[in-house]
């Protein structure tokens, strides 16, 4: 990775930082909301991609997202301040993810994906069947507004956490984890021959990925003021990070962020134009894009420069 390769990523963050300070007019609150959820989608996609780099195609991200949201809400109910509740909810999610990682250690491919999907359903069922005075049951749970409902502040916090996620991703790509993950992805037997501790590194990938996804869940809970098992643990929250990463470009830092930005804007545009049928058109556009761009949007960028991947 070279300094040139980091330029597009730096440009993205400069533009994203300037966005909330632009004269957005009467639609300012609406545009900030779109920007906020775009950043959350970027965190989810990038956190999923970090796990995928170790060869694990997970469908448990809805569980990590939901555990972060519910963990944060329950910690706030104890009187804990949000700056403490946020990292603690993410840390708790990371610790629980290690259990999932240990249990599914011998699985791969379709069997691993099914196991992680089942884990999400188990967590959702547990949350839904907790006493209503604890987690709200199937009816959901009210959550205090993050930063008192300040839209600009919420956006900037989401941008900060996306920057943190990008920093972690870059550290993974340039450190020992990168080589270990690549070896495991090529084949665990080969990785063991090379001296890679597959168990340790796969669990590390689980912890890092789930911690970051939980932060996205915290942002969601604090922005929407309300969480429910069906919405928070929905299958869409497991599928979206996967498709976004593929669309943007796997095993890169900029790719999932770029994918989240393009898809979120496209979703809003189609919703305004096509109305009720926008999801069908959105799905077709996404499917065709993946077929025509097997290396994602990053594949297009690579054609125009030779500075390496980000």
Predicted regions and their residues:
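Membrane-interfacial amphipathic/re-entrant helices at transmembrane-helix boundaries
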Residues: 1-42, 79-85, 309-310
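Residue-level recognition of pore/gate-forming positions within transmembrane alpha-helices
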Residues: 37, 41, 69-70, 90-94, ...
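Helix-loop-helix "hairpin" substructures at the membrane interface of multi-pass membrane proteins
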Residues: 149-229
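Alpha-helical transmembrane segments within multi-pass membrane transporters and channels
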Residues: 79-121, 258-261
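Transmembrane alpha-helical segments in multi-pass inner-membrane proteins
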Residues: 206-288, 292
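Single transmembrane alpha-helix segments in multi-pass membrane proteins
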Residues: 28-77, 103-112, 190, 249-253
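Cytosolic-side transmembrane-helix boundaries in multi-pass membrane proteins
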Residues: 1-17, 186-203, 269-310
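Extracellular/periplasmic helix-loop junction at the C-terminal end of a transmembrane helix
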Residues: 119-150, 157, 178, 275, ...
